[in-house]
Amino acid sequence: MATPTQSPTNVPEETDPFFYDYATVQTVGMTLATIMFVLGIIIILSKKVKCRKADSRSESPTCKSCKSELPSSAPGGGGV
């Protein structure tokens, strides 16, 4: 049986900078995941994502992006 050559010294333990309260991390993570999931479902099911007034001449920011995707709604009615 081997004996230690030095006696153990009492070194004050420093606080670990990577110590996490895993219960809190898990709770916050699940809460954020739930919120993002519900917001994603709301965005998918929302009618506001689609451009309902693509035929009108209003220049709302939503319809501006829709008009760039639809070649038939371009001025002059020409295709790309």
UniProtKB/Swiss-Prot annotation:
Associates with and regulates the activity of the sodium/potassium-transporting ATPase (NKA) which catalyzes the hydrolysis of ATP coupled with the exchange of Na(+) and K(+) ions across the plasma membrane. Reduces the apparent affinity for external K(+), an effect that depends on the presence of external Na(+) and voltage. Increases the apparent affinity for intracellular Na(+). Regulatory subunit of the sodium/potassium-transporting ATPase which is composed of a catalytic alpha subunit, a non-catalytic beta subunit and an additional regulatory subunit. The regulatory subunit, a member of the FXYD protein family, modulates the enzymatic activity in a tissue- and isoform-specific way by changing affinities of the Na+/K+-ATPase toward Na(+), K(+) or ATP. Gene3D superfamilies: Single helix bin. O-glycosylated; required for stabilization and translocation to the plasma membrane. The modification Phosphoserine is found at S73. This is FXYD domain-containing ion transport regulator 7. GO terms for cellular component: plasma membrane. The chain crosses the membrane at residues 23-45. Belongs to the FXYD family. It is a single-pass type I membrane protein. It comes from the Eukaryota. The gene is Fxyd7. CDD domains: FXYD7. Residues 1-22 are extracellular. It comes from Mus musculus. InterPro entries: FXYD7 (IPR047284), FXYD_motif (IPR047297), Ion-transport_regulator_FXYD (IPR000272). Changing V80A: Reduces the rate and degree of FXYD7 O-glycosylation. Decreases expression at the plasma membrane. One of its GO terms (molecular function) is ion channel regulator activity. Pfam families: ATP1G1_PLM_MAT8. GO terms for biological process: potassium ion transport; regulation of monoatomic ion transport; sodium ion transport. It is found in: Cell membrane. Residues 55-80 are annotated as: Disordered. The transmembrane domain is important for the interaction with NKA and with the functional effect of FXYD7.
